[in-house]
Amino acid sequence: MSASNVSLLHETSRQVAAGGSAGLVEICLMHPLDVVKTRFQVQRSVTDPQSYRTVRGSFQMIFRTEGLFGFYKGIIPPILAETPKRAVKFSTFELYKKFLGYMSLSPGLTFLIAGLGSGLTEAVVVNPFEVVKVGLQVNRNLFKEQPSTFAYARQIIKKEGLGFQGLNKGLTATLGRHGIFNMVYFGFYHNVKNIIPSSKDPTLEFLRKFGIGFVSGTMGSVFNIPFDVAKSRIQGPQPVPGEIKYRSCFKTMEMIYREEGILALYKGLVPKVMRLGPGGGVMLLVYEYTYAWLQENW
């Protein structure tokens, strides 16, 4: 193996390790908000006495009826997926950015397109895990009464298969969700980070990067949430058992808009921003500091 190939493999290994670490930390800290967000998105009416109206009320209801572990339903699939997912997220962003560097594009546009490409690639990897995660998150039974992650995955495969009606349903919505989020997330972060001067003070530099990452995650959440709502409806339980109402991404968006209004496409925005705002800052910081440490020590 040539020296250049060894160097590339070493660099990719650092990106995998740093990306996996960033994803694991973000998931463990922010997963309860992801559960609340999904519950908001799959409900179709607030007249149900078991409906979720506010973030605080949702936390209280889940804790009262499902216990503390109710906030961690569906956490195994994202944990299992985080290392490959974040490895794909960060390594493909760097790969696409390097490839686009050979073209006559402005740096700002390069960051946006590389982010879009990384999001689309990431979506293909993560979608089966998302199908399992959403199904577990919307289950209102006590944690000990619901099927295990692997049992539920086998159940989906047995009943619906591996295709676009089974373990890969909602792929188009997932492509939209991740593509748009990463385009805004990476595009805004790298463009603004290069504009705002860095600080020699470690604390101020930490706050600078966290602040930019926070805004990046918030903006990405606002722009991609209609795709997120459509994804939850397609991958979650259908209104009538045995009858598939939500099939394709854009038809699902149109149906939600027609039946529930434009604001329904933004259900779960508050818990999503509460998760991916600070989560976006945490993830980029963990990645950058872990990657810098690995460059010095490995």
Swiss-Prot record:
The keyword Lipoprotein does not apply. It holds the Pfam family Mito_carr. It catalyses: 2-oxoadipate(in) + 2-oxoglutarate(out) = 2-oxoadipate(out) + 2-oxoglutarate(in); hexanedioate(in) + 2-oxoglutarate(out) = hexanedioate(out) + 2-oxoglutarate(in); L-2-aminoadipate(in) + 2-oxoglutarate(out) = L-2-aminoadipate(out) + 2-oxoglutarate(in); glutarate(in) + 2-oxoglutarate(out) = glutarate(out) + 2-oxoglutarate(in). GO terms for molecular function: alpha-ketoglutarate transmembrane transporter activity; antiporter activity. It is found in: Mitochondrion inner membrane. It is a multi-pass membrane protein. The chain crosses the membrane at residues 16-36, 69-88, 112-132, 166-186, 204-224, 276-296. Its main location: mitochondrion. The keyword Metal-binding does not apply. Solcar repeats lie at residues 10-99, 106-195, 204-293. GO terms for biological process: lipid transport; mitochondrial alpha-ketoglutarate transmembrane transport. InterPro entries: Mito_2-oxodicarb_carrier (IPR051752), Mitochondrial_sb/sol_carrier (IPR018108), Mt_carrier_dom_sf (IPR023395). SUPFAM superfamilies: Mitochondrial carrier. Signal peptide: none annotated. Keywords: Antiport, Lipid transport, Membrane, Mitochondrion, Mitochondrion inner membrane, Repeat, Transmembrane, Transmembrane helix, Transport. PROSITE patterns: SOLCAR (PS50920). GO terms for cellular component: mitochondrial inner membrane; mitochondrion. Belongs to the mitochondrial carrier (TC 2.A.29) family. Transports dicarboxylates across the inner membranes of mitochondria by a counter-exchange mechanism. Can transport 2-oxoadipate (2-oxohexanedioate), 2-oxoglutarate, adipate (hexanedioate), glutarate, and to a lesser extent, pimelate (heptanedioate), 2-oxopimelate (2-oxoheptanedioate), 2-aminoadipate (2-aminohexanedioate), oxaloacetate, and citrate. This is Mitochondrial 2-oxodicarboxylate carrier.
